[in-house]
């Protein structure tokens, strides 16, 4: 159900509270998922004119799970705070003295419900952390992370239900990784969606038993960061080592991700240097180039009255990854009506060269390759 449809069914006096929750409500580490409501119902009599819904189920993303809590207002007394039912978490009994925004409920503040939900989620986190005491191993993982503020202050924990047969229970740690994304080139962060939310990397580590014999890590990147780093398949994190612990594993993933970010930033500056060198060496031979991301360059060149184009595609992780050179005749066509072309990646190249050296080497390579390209164009293309 979309937020607008849901809000149209809410009692008008309660609508500001719920609007703040579904439109601006982001609780916890996963900033890419908003709070949402379902199962709208009314406690009013059938004679009460609508819209009159005053109770609903609130879906809250937490540690890779979705908490489903019932929130019950009374449309006849909209100035009163709501009641809460915590669904499957019947053992969760929040401390009323710590719910300051509930104790001092202010119906004139549209965000008062959202503030109470945030306080409840904080207490729910403490409730889940307390459940880890049933496992010395999982408690060790938690306490060692807690000693590091960069991890302990950005962590959610969900302890699964205990298995009645084995006495085991699973647990999931969700951590917001302290990786700086602020220097990623802005062109890579465009056009993902209208409201990309916070740029964030979350590491989920699931312990399927209390002795950590089955541990499954997974990395989640916010949409813009995933796009900037080359897509979901571009980053593979290592498996959790047998006998390892989170306080050693999490920094490894941070280091891997930081290096990936640095590759992207370095690639952007190196591509700009590369294209600047080609502009200097080839001058008026440059037809066009990508002036934002510096990922493409096209040259129009001549060799013994034979004109040809060279399209240069620079990869995201340049200079580690070699550019592709595509030679294209301006005279000859293939059977499908396309200009005859040949792509080349087997040419002299070193990622250690600067842009000027790459431009000089490319110019020398063009002179050696063009004769055979011209011959192939005449042999295989049609005028």
Curated annotation (Swiss-Prot):
Region (UEV-like 2): 275-364
Molecular functions per Gene Ontology: polyubiquitin modification-dependent protein binding; tumor necrosis factor receptor binding
UniProt cross-references to Pfam families, sorted A to Z: BRE (PF06113)
UniProt record, GO biological process: apoptotic process; cell division; cellular response to ionizing radiation; chromatin organization; DNA damage response; double-strand break repair; mitotic G2 DNA damage checkpoint signaling; negative regulation of apoptotic process
Location, primary (coarse class): cytoplasm
Region (UEV-like 1): 30-147
Cross-referenced InterPro entries: BRE
Positions bearing N-acetylmethionine: 1
Entry's family note: Belongs to the BABAM2 family.
Known partners and oligomeric status: Component of the ARISC complex, at least composed of UIMC1/RAP80, ABRAXAS1, BRCC3/BRCC36, BABAM2 and BABAM1/NBA1. Component of the BRCA1-A complex, at least composed of BRCA1, BARD1, UIMC1/RAP80, ABRAXAS1, BRCC3/BRCC36, BABAM2 and BABAM1/NBA1. In the BRCA1-A complex, interacts directly with ABRAXAS1, BRCC3/BRCC36 and BABAM1/NBA1. Binds polyubiquitin. Component of the BRISC complex, at least composed of ABRAXAS2, BRCC3/BRCC36, BABAM2 and BABAM1/NBA1. Identified in a complex with SHMT2 and the other subunits of the BRISC complex.
Role summary: Component of the BRCA1-A complex, a complex that specifically recognizes 'Lys-63'-linked ubiquitinated histones H2A and H2AX at DNA lesions sites, leading to target the BRCA1-BARD1 heterodimer to sites of DNA damage at double-strand breaks (DSBs). The BRCA1-A complex also possesses deubiquitinase activity that specifically removes 'Lys-63'-linked ubiquitin on histones H2A and H2AX.
Domain remarks: Contains 2 ubiquitin-conjugating enzyme family-like (UEV-like) regions. These regions lack the critical Cys residues required for ubiquitination but retain the ability to bind ubiquitin.
Protein name: BRISC and BRCA1-A complex member 2
């Amino acid at each position: 159900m979309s937020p607008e449809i849901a809000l149209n069914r809410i009692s008008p006096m309660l609508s500001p509270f719920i609007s703040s929750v579904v439109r601006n409500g982001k609780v916890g580490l996963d900033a890419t998922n908003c709070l949402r409501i379902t199962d709208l119902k009314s406690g009013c009599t059938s004679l009460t004119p609508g819209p009159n819904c005053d109770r609903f189920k609130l879906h809250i993303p937490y540690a890779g799970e979705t908490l489903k809590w019932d929130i019950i207002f009374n449309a006849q007394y909209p100035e009163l705070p709501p009641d809460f039912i915590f669904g499957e978490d019947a053992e969760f009994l929040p401390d009323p003295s710590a719910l300051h925004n509930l104790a001092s409920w202010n119906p004139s503040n549209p965000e008062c419900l959202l503030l109470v939900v945030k306080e409840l989620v904080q207490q729910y986190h403490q409730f889940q952390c307390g459940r880890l005491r049933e496992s010395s191993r999982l408690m060790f993982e938690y306490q060692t992370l807690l000693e590091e503020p960069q991890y302990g202050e950005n962590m959610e924990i969900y302890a699964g239900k205990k298995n009645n047969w084995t006495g085991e229970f699973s647990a999931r740690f969700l951590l917001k990784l302290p990786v700086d994304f602020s220097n990623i080139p802005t062109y890579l962060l465009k056009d993902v969606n209208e409201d990309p939310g916070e740029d964030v990397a979350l590491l989920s580590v699931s312990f399927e038993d209390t002795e950590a014999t089955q541990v499954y890590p997974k990395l989640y990147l916010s949409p813009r960061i995933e796009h900037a780093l080359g897509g979901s398949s571009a980053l593979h994190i290592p498996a959790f080592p047998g006998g390892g612990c989170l306080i050693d594993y999490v920094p490894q993933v941070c280091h891997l991700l930081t290096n990936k970010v640095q590759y992207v930033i370095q690639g952007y500056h190196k591509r700009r240097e590369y294209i600047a060198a080609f502009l200097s060496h080839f001058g008026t031979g440059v037809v066009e180039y990508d002036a934002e991301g510096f990922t493409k360059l096209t040259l129009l060149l001549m060799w013994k009255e034979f004109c040809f184009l060279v399209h240069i595609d620079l990869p995201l992780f340049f200079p580690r990854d070699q550019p592709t050179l595509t030679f294209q005749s301006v005279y000859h066509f293939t059977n499908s009506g396309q200009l005859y072309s040949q792509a080349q990646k087997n040419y002299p190249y070193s990622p250690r060269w600067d842009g000027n050296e790459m431009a000089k080497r490319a110019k020398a390579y063009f002179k050696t390759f063009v004769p055979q390209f011209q011959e192939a164009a005449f042999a295989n293309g049609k005028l």
